[in-house]
C-alpha cells in the first residue's frame, strides 16, 4: 500500500478519486499492481492505523497533479517496489507534509511491536515539548531503537532526545553519510525527469526516499542499539 499525502481538501474528493485511478493505471502500465490510499488529513491517516498485519507502507508527498509530478511519483513507486522486493516489512517515513498527531503514536508503537524494522519521523523543533516523551515511551516499552530524524533541521536541533533514551538521533543526511562505505561524505544525485546523466542533488525529504529505496545497501533495515553503537561511534 502506498499512502499519498494529498494537499487537497475534502471538497476535492471527487477529483482525488480520478487522480487515484490515474496513478493506478500508470503503475499497471509498468507491470506494478499497487494499492493507493489518498490521505487528506491526519485524521484521515489515522483511519488506516493501527495496521493489523505488517505492511509495506510509504508516506509520500505529491505536490501537484501535472505531468512532471506524475513522472516523479512513478519514480518513487519504482523505488518503493524495489524496497519491497528486498524483504523489508514496514518502514514509516512520515514526510514534512503529514505530521503524525498525538493519537498516531500508539499506532507507530504497535507497528514496532508487530515487527517494523525501523521508524523514521520528522523532528521539527516546535515539537521539543512532546517528542522526547514519545520516543522514550516507544523505546522503553517496545525495546526497539527508534531513530528520529528530520530532513530540514541540523543535528543540534535533535540532541534533546539523544541522551539517556537508548537511541541516537541524526538527520537523514548524517545517517546516510555515516553508514556509507568508508564513512565518507557522499553526494546523491537523483536522475532528473529528462533522464540527463547529471541528475539533481537530493536535499531535504528526498534524501529519505533514497534511504528508503537503498536501505539494503546502507544496512539500515534493522536499526538496533548494538548495530548503531558499532557503526556510528
Curated annotation (Swiss-Prot):
Q: Which UniProt keywords apply?
A: Late protein
**What switches on its expression?**
Expressed in the late phase of the viral replicative cycle.
Family statement = Belongs to the asfivirus H233R family.
Q: What is this protein called?
A: Uncharacterized protein H233R
Question: Which species is this record about?
Answer: African swine fever virus (isolate Pig/Kenya/KEN-50/1950) (ASFV)
Amino acid at each position: 500500500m502506498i499512502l499519498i499525502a494529498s494537499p487537497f481538501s475534502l471538497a476535492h474528493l471527487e477529483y482525488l478519486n480520478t487522480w487515484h485511478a490515474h496513478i493506478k493505471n500508470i503503475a499497471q502500465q509498468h507491470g506494478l499492481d499497487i494499492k493507493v490510499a489518498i490521505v487528506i488529513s491526519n485524521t484521515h491517516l489515522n483511519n488506516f492505523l493501527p495496521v493489523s498485519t505488517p505492511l509495506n507502507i510509504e508516506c509520500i508527498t505529491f505536490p501537484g497533479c501535472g505531468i512532471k509530478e506524475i513522472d516523479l511519483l512513478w519514480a518513487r513507486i519504482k523505488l518503493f517496489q524495489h524496497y519491497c522486493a528486498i524483504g523489508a516489512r514496514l518502514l514509516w517515513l512520515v514526510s514534512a507534509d503529514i505530521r503524525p498527531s498525538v493519537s498516531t503514536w500508539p499506532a507507530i508503537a504497535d507497528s514496532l511491536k508487530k515487527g517494523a524494522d525501523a521508524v523514521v519521523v520528522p523532528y521539527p523543533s516546535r515539537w521539543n515539548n512532546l517528542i522526547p516523551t514519545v520516543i522514550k515511551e516507544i523505546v522503553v516499552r517496545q525495546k526497539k531503537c527508534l531513530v528520529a530524524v528530520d530532513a530540514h533541521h541540523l543535528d543540534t536541533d535533535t540532541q534533546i532526545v539523544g541522551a539517556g533514551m537508548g537511541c541516537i538521533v541524526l538527520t537523514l543526511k548524517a545517517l546516510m553519510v555515516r553508514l556509507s562505505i568508508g564513512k565518507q561524505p557522499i553526494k546523491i544525485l537523483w536522475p532528473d525527469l529528462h533522464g540527463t546523466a547529471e541528475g539533481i542533488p537530493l536535499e531535504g525529504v528526498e534524501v529519505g526516499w533514497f534511504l528508503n529505496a537503498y536501505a539494503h545497501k546502507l544496512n539500515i533495515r534493522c536499526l538496533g542499539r548494538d548495530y548503531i553503537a558499532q557503526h556510528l561511534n
